[in-house]
């Protein structure tokens, strides 16, 4: 009986460290700090590609690559840099909305900014034993605008993406309460 009581009084799954970090990190957070490519590199982030920013209004640099949060499985990120937080919000929000979530535009013919579109999508097969052809889904469930960066972070939904963005921001020394 005592053992049952111990487990029954255990941790609430809603009180995970991930959901606690979500309480601090907001999807849009102003910061006076201007982040650079070097800030990202200092975390152990592995840049796979640097995209041409032509057509991505206001952006100065875009990285695509992966990072391993706390030694876990590598997750993919697309990090867009802007001259300031205001420019990131004003010029980059619509592009980030278009590239993330269930309503992401993943067809090159329809996307506003086509560079790297293949890296923003997952292909999945139909169920085993069926003749289903599968489909395409957005790799990035959501994004964070933090200072002069827009980070698209791998995740099944916006909450997963926010957690992963938060982990990389913390590794960069960013303070969500600044």
Regions found by a protein language model. Give the residues of each.
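Second-shell loop/turn segments in exported
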Residues: 22-27, 75-81, 149-158
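C-terminal motif of bacterial Sec signal peptides marking the signal peptidase cleavage site
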Residues: 5-8
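Short, solvent-exposed recognition patches
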Residues: 37, 41-131, 135-136
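A short, solvent-exposed beta-edge/loop patch
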Residues: 111-178
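N-terminal "mature-domain start" segment
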Residues: 10-68, 159-178
């Amino acid at each position: 009986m005592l053992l049952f009581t111990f487990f029954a009084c255990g941790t609430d799954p809603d009180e995970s460290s991930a959901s606690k970090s979500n309480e601090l990190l907001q999807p849009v957070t102003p910061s006076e700090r201007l982040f650079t490519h070097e800030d990202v590199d200092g975390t152990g982030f592995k840049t796979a590609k640097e995209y041409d920013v032509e057509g991505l209004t206001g952006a100065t640099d875009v990285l695509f690559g992966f990072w391993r949060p706390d030694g876990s499985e590598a997750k993919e990120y697309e990090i867009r840099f802007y001259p300031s937080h205001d420019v990131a919000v004003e010029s980059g929000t619509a592009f980030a909305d278009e590239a993330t979530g269930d309503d992401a535009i993943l067809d090159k013919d329809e996307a506003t900014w086509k560079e790297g579109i293949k890296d923003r999508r997952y292909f999945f097969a139909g169920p085993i034993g069926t003749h289903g052809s599968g489909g395409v889904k957005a790799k990035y469930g959501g994004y964070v605008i933090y200072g002069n960066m827009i980070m698209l972070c791998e995740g099944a939904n916006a909450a997963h993406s926010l957690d992963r963005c938060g982990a990389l921001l913390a590794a960069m020394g960013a303070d969500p309460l600044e």
